[in-house]
């Protein structure tokens, strides 16, 4: 395991909301929710820390957010402006290193093992980046510093907002033992429920399990979690990373025959995919449906649209059509997935935040 790399994960604090509060003094100190009209369909894209005190969080339906935070200020936001500010942040990163792997508009990995400032301490680099962003742009960022990307990303969320957390190689396992497993990469709702049933709540609980037992219970996720909790993970920051597809899938706790449940899953996936595509500034043209039957037979069906889209409803309609054509209730479904491929960048003037 290579522990010589110096990797920083920078995560802007409540990015969209913070930009709006910076630009609009009337929003400062108030619960601001980026998500449009709470009386219409939509989900929260992000919200200010004032709104989070009421329990509002990203991906929550805006109607629910309005109930939790009746005094909240709801706005649609301005994606083109967020893209512009994101490019300003990226320019600041480039003053320190060219080895930058963007994850979305508001977060990125930086390898500063060899940096342009000649700083030997990655902690100093991270702090300098935070101060520069605040001084020049009036925004705060949190940073995680470690020897691999997995730990750096977890660490950046540890002391939000405007915090910095450093995890040295010799501290990694002890640090990970205290972390809830829901914070581990790849642990979604289904995996989290399985871990909970197994009595695994923290990294320390996870570490008690053998590699074989985790693989038996969780398959490939078990192998990944076994490595992650021991600090073994990818430490290569890839500046040429380019997503070829965006998707979501789930394995049902019990095999499913009901088309309504399958369609509900596709709608949830479509909303998640829409959110991710907008963050990546991309839209796609091909929708792919994946079905795995109870006998583990797997099929994929695809539909290429007439135009590029990042709209959840259009994505769902295409996936639902594929489902109706492919599945006649002949056997129960173990897994369902939805992916959008054939991606390309969205021009700034066409970026949409409608319903988010």
From Swiss-Prot:
GO CC terms of this entry: cytosol
EC number(s) per entry: 2.7.7.7
Cofactor, how bound (note): Binds 2 magnesium ions per subunit.
Pfam families cross-referenced by the UniProt entry: IMS, IMS_C, IMS_HHH
SUPFAM superfamilies (UniProt xref): DNA/RNA polymerases (SSF56672), Lesion bypass DNA polymerase (Y-family), little finger domain (SSF100879)
Signal peptide: none
Limits of the UmuC domain: 7-188
InterPro entries: DNA/RNA_pol_sf, DNA_pol_Y-fam_lit_finger_sf, DNA_pol_Y-fam_little_finger, DNA_polymerase-Y, DNApol_IV, PolY_HhH_motif, Rev_trsase/Diguanyl_cyclase, UmuC
Catalytic activity: DNA(n) + a 2'-deoxyribonucleoside 5'-triphosphate = DNA(n+1) + diphosphate
Keyword set, alphabetical order: Cytoplasm, DNA damage, DNA repair, DNA replication, DNA-binding, DNA-directed DNA polymerase, Magnesium, Metal-binding, Mutator protein, Nucleotidyltransferase, Transferase
Disulfide bonds: none
Amino-acid positions noted as binding Mg(2+) in the UniProt annotation, renumbered to this chain: 11, 106
Membrane-spanning ranges: none
Subcellular location: Cytoplasm
GO biological process: DNA-templated DNA replication; error-prone translesion synthesis; SOS response
Cofactors (names): Mg(2+)
Active site: 107
The keyword DNA repair is annotated on this UniProt entry: yes
Molecular-function GO term, any one: magnesium ion binding
NCBIfam families in UniProt: PRK02406.1 (NF002677), PRK14133.1 (NF010731)
PANTHER family, alphabetized: DNA POLYMERASE KAPPA, DNA REPAIR POLYMERASE UMUC / TRANSFERASE FAMILY MEMBER
Assembly: Monomer.
Similarity field: Belongs to the DNA polymerase type-Y family.
Function: Poorly processive, error-prone DNA polymerase involved in untargeted mutagenesis. Copies undamaged DNA at stalled replication forks, which arise in vivo from mismatched or misaligned primer ends. These misaligned primers can be extended by PolIV. Exhibits no 3'-5' exonuclease (proofreading) activity. May be involved in translesional synthesis, in conjunction with the beta clamp from PolIII.
Protein's name according to its UniProt entry: DNA polymerase IV
Gene: dinB
């Amino acid at each position: 395991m290579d522990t010589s790399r110096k990797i920083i994960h920078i995560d802007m604090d409540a990015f969209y909301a913070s930009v709006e509060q910076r630009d609009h003094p009337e929003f400062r100190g108030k619960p601001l929710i980026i998500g449009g009209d709470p009386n219409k369909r939509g989900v929260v894209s992000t919200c200010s820390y004032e709104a989070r005190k009421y329990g509002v969080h990203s991906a929550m339906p805006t109607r629910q957010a309005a109930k939790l935070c009746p005094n909240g200020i709801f706005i649609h936001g301005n994606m083109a402006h967020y893209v512009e500010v994101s490019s300003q942040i990226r320019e600041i990163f480039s003053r320190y290193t060219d080895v930058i792997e963007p994850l979305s508009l508001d977060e990125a990995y930086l390898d500063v093992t060899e940096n342009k400032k000649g700083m030997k301490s990655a902690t100093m680099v991270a702090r300098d980046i935070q101060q520069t962003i605040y001084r020049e742009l009036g925004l705060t960022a949190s940073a995680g510093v470690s020897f691999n990307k997995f730990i750096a990303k977890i660490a950046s969320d540890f002391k939000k907002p405007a915090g910095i957390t450093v995890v040295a190689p010799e501290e990694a396992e002890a640090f990970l033992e205290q972390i809830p497993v829901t914070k581990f990469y790849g642990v979604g709702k289904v995996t989290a429920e399985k871990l909970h049933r197994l009595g695994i709540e923290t990294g320390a609980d996870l570490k008690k399990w053998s590699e074989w037992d985790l693989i038996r219970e969780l398959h490939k996720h078990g192998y990944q979690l076994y490595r992650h909790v021991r600090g073994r993970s990818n430490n290569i920051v890839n500046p040429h990373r380019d997503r070829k597809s965006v998707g979501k899938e789930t394995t049902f706790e019990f095999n499913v025959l009901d088309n309504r449940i399958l369609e509900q899953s596709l709608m949830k996936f479509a909303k998640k995919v829409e959110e991710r595509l907008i963050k990546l500034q991309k839209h796609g043209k091909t929708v792919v449906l994946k079905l795995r039957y109870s006998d583990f037979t797997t099929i994929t069906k695809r539909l290429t649209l007439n135009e590029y889209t990042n709209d959840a409803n259009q994505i769902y309609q295409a996936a639902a059509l594929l489902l109706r054509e492919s599945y006649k209730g002949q056997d129960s479904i173990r897994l369902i997935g939805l992916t959008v491929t054939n991606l390309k960048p969205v021009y700034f003037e066409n970026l949409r935040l409608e319903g988010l």
